[in-house]
Amino acid sequence: MKVIFLKDVKGKGKKGEVKNVADGYAQNFLFKQGLAIEATPANLKALEAQKNKQKKEAEEELARAKQLKEKIDTLTVTLFAKAGEGGRLFGSITSKQIAEALQQQHDIKIDKRKIELDDAIRALGYTNVPIKLHPEVTATLKVHVQEQK
């Protein structure tokens, strides 16, 4: 019997796959557990429509990420921090502070976990900070750290 998997089933199939399984296994386990549905022409059509919708949403998300990247690449965020001699900061600038400053100064909300800061910024001046907006899109934000007077 052909079935469409609604969830991943270990050793049998992944979500969205159409596979042939034993009739008893399908009726007594997969259908009752809500793990699969019968692969009727109507269900196959619905599956195809769902896949197309997901693909379209993914493309739109990628387009939005590219658009945001172009905007972020032109921006500079200015932060103020107390510094000692030689431009060394007392403390450091973290990804959380960068995300908050981006929100306040440019009204762009970015999750701090998307800011790929290897180490916190510990010196005055300009630093280029990569921001992963999408698995395929990474923007670069210029962060300017100035001494707080």
From Swiss-Prot:
Keyword Ribonucleoprotein assigned: yes
Key words of the record: Ribonucleoprotein, Ribosomal protein, RNA-binding, rRNA-binding
Coiled coil: none
Pfam families: Ribosomal_L9_C, Ribosomal_L9_N
InterPro entries with a match to the protein in the record: Ribosomal_bL9 (IPR000244), Ribosomal_bL9/RNase_H1_N (IPR009027), Ribosomal_bL9_bac/chp (IPR020594), Ribosomal_bL9_C (IPR020069), Ribosomal_bL9_C_sf (IPR036791), Ribosomal_bL9_N (IPR020070), Ribosomal_bL9_N_sf (IPR036935)
GO terms for cellular component: ribonucleoprotein complex; ribosome
A Gene Ontology biological process term: translation
The keyword Coiled coil is assigned to this record: no
Gene Ontology molecular function, alphabetical: rRNA binding; structural constituent of ribosome
Gene3D superfamilies (UniProt xref): Ribosomal protein L9, C-terminal domain, Ribosomal protein L9, N-terminal domain
Family that this chain belongs to: Belongs to the bacterial ribosomal protein bL9 family.
Main function: Binds to the 23S rRNA.
Protein name listed in UniProt: Large ribosomal subunit protein bL9
Organism: Anoxybacillus flavithermus (strain DSM 21510 / WK1)
